[in-house]
């Protein structure tokens, strides 16, 4: 049994105001975060992304690297459910595990996917979901009628995982009405399948508004750290200069307490800065112990 991923990114962006799936976060389009997460698991034989016809050439160009050679582009449909079906129709065989994920959820990560793979091995249908912890109100005409019992309430997310034969059977029964279902888990439930909950405790925000995109950008940015470093040494007569751990033979040498390896020092210094560890000189002081030491060691 092989794992196949379907990334659903064929929305028109009507509510968002543009194609949110190709919005850029840190020099990378939104949809690509999901593809990369699935690729990083090294557990998928094929990844199919459903996208609008207008974006096929754009996405094909963005995925031209060899890393994405097993990613297949599929023209989406008029609805989310139709887009999933279009992608599903491109899958051969009958014994695959199908992972369906929204491209608008770029915060999905390798660890969660790997956990889902393991959890779903013995299940026909699994949905990633988050338990509701906040108070929920039933509202009519902007008036709160009553507080809903949240004991058994969960927020359905993606990925959702199905045995291929499950989807084949539900499509046989419901193909003409799939547009009536908000996701494939609801479709499977209506056909009598038990959809097992796999609890997600990690952020998995779905981009619906500009504010969602802004929030996700902040969260992804918070995982990035930057450091700036520089190093230089005076030169004197000698028998060579150390650069990157290698000695370049010449009639000069770096004037330094250590070996004066400017390349290694210029790399270590920004790493210390990015990790808020201070300057390289704070860790390697001018002591007898450090005299003429190799910087790469």
Q: Predicted regions: what is each one?
A:
Residues 120, 272-297:
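Glycine- and Gly-Pro-enriched alpha-helical subdomains that act as flexible
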Residues 32-95, 175:
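Conserved N-terminal catalytic core of the sugar/cofactor nucleotidyltransferase
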Residues 1-56:
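N-terminal glycine-rich phosphate-binding loop and ensuing alpha1 helix
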Residues 137-160:
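Short, flexible, basic/aromatic active-site loop/helix in glycosyltransferases
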Residues 223-232, 238-240, 245-246, 250-258, ...:
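Terminal domain-initiation and capping elements
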Residues 104, 263, 267, 271, ...:
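Active-site His/Glu-centered metal-binding helix of metallohydrolases
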Residues 79-140, 157:
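Conserved beta-loop-beta/alpha segment of the NTase-like Rossmann-fold superfamily
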Residues 154-227:
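Conserved alpha/beta core of the MobA/IspD/sugar-nucleotide pyrophosphorylase nucleotidyltransferase superfamily
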